[in-house]
């Protein structure tokens, strides 16, 4: 209403609008945090399954050297206080790993048309990362829109579905292998 009638400004409207923006950013942060944890779990599980749980496997074979150097530097600068190396990845690193090891991740992390390619299939992670940057800086004058929040929630739901489908198919495969 205010967009069509700029003079509309009843008492308390400004405070209400600010609270709504804060709520949207707060909800978006929760969604993004869950997406990041899901990505971390999925990427690390897949790398360790494919290359082995030792650093000589998943870390060396599964993670591109440029990411290893960046993450390793942070690990060393932080004296490993956050835990092992995997606790030093950024959200966007998971996209780079997925693109680098596309054959492992295309069925798990790609959204959109089948066969659309690495860049398009993982572009949703760029969106999530850009929104993460906005809400991570409390001093930012930018708030996420309801539309942004809904898109983040949609990505979270799709990721959860794909990861659940992967778990189901892995369970079925291991059940068949055990017979």
Language model regions located:
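Amphipathic alpha-helical interface elements
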Residues: 1-179
